[in-house]
Amino acid sequence: MATIKDVAKLVGVSTTTVSHVINKTRFVAEDTTKAVWEAIASLNYSPSAVARSLKVNTTKSIGMIITTSEAPYFAEIVLAVEEYCYRQGYSLFLCNTQNDAEKVQNHLDMLIKKRVDGILVMCSEYTENSLALFNGTNVPMVVMDWGPNDGKSDRIIDHCLDGGYMATKHLIDNGHRDIAIIAGYLYKTTAKARYDGFVKAMTEAGLLIRKEWIFENDFQPEGGYESMNNLLNQDKLPTAVICGCDAMALGVISAITEKGLSVPQDISVIGYDNIHSSRFYAPPLTTIHQSKTRLGQMAIDTLLERIQQHNEQPSEPVTPKVLEFYPELVVRSSVRNLNQ
């Protein structure tokens, strides 16, 4: 196997010159640069990415810790992040926690050992041990709205409480008074914030929040399906159901139609996230829009800026940034107007 010394010997230059050509860390004459690359090709020399990263202090890689890349909302964000990383010349290490807090710590440990330049976090399964692990390193990090607040990382706030309020207010404005909610598990930051938005809107309108109409479940179609079936077994039914996410709404609609009822004629349904497939539901789903592409680009831009600052001034303390973007209502066909 060829080494950098073999390349230098063939060209008649020092190994330092070859290194500068490969890493583009110093100007090298055009003829010499061409000769180095020709020698690399002829010898089939493959520079060690690890060794190169030790010299230039970068691996051109980013780690992303996410609850699950299988869920449509997360999958769309991962796609946006990966595409934007690619355009910026970075590789992406994707780590799924699958709702396992222990995996967060293991993934953090692995990413740090791989010397990634920065880390994105999009999960709620975060322990004090995980925080201690990260705080013991200098790896730049950006945390999404539902992640931990360690006082050190940049954060992106998506104002999902406002989104939950917006969804509920839309139902109220359309004449609905008997409203149920099928939320994600409320120990998760994002599920709790969306639920709090529901409570705020119902309270402002002076409407009764029935405990028997509050459900918690997985952010999956199965979770929505199970909870909706439990709701349909009750004597009194709501005129509308708020879903913690669009994936849950798919299960909710399935449960309603299997009972011989219709959406929205019998029960209206509103989702959250505006995933790509929600427009193709039957009926097309009214939902709360969260721009996955914008979120992904904002996260990467923020992280790359922090990485650059870290490389240029590693000992300089930084003040964490808070970036914000807001949800929007997307009206389709799954909510009936009872005022008409």
UniProtKB/Swiss-Prot annotation:
Mention any Pfam family matching this sequence: LacI
Any idea which residues the entry calls the DNA-binding region?
4-23, 48-56
Q: Which UniProt keywords apply?
A: DNA-binding, Purine biosynthesis, Repressor, Transcription, Transcription regulation
Q: Which GO terms describe its biological process?
A: negative regulation of DNA-templated transcription; purine nucleotide biosynthetic process
Q: Where does the source fall among the domains of life?
A: Bacteria
> What positions does the entry give for hypoxanthine binding?
73, 188, 190, 219, 273
Molecular function terms, GO-annotated: DNA-binding transcription factor activity; transcription cis-regulatory region binding
Per the record, the pathway is: Purine metabolism; purine nucleotide biosynthesis [regulation]
Q: Which InterPro entries match?
A: HTH_LacI (IPR000843), LacI/GalR-like_sensor (IPR046335), Lambda_DNA-bd_dom_sf (IPR010982), Peripla_BP_I (IPR028082), Tscrpt_reg_HTH_PurR (IPR023588)
CDD domains xrefs:
HTH_LacI, PBP1_PurR
Gene3D superfamilies according to UniProt = 3.40.50.2300, lambda repressor-like DNA-binding domains
* Assembly mode: Homodimer.
Question: Per the entry's comment, what about the domains?
Answer: Consists of two structural and functional domains: an N-terminal DNA-binding domain, approximately the first 60 residues, and a larger C-terminal domain, approximately 280 residues, which imparts the function of corepressor binding and oligomerization.
Name listed for the protein in its UniProt record: HTH-type transcriptional repressor PurR
Native organism: Glaesserella parasuis serovar 5 (strain SH0165) (Haemophilus parasuis)
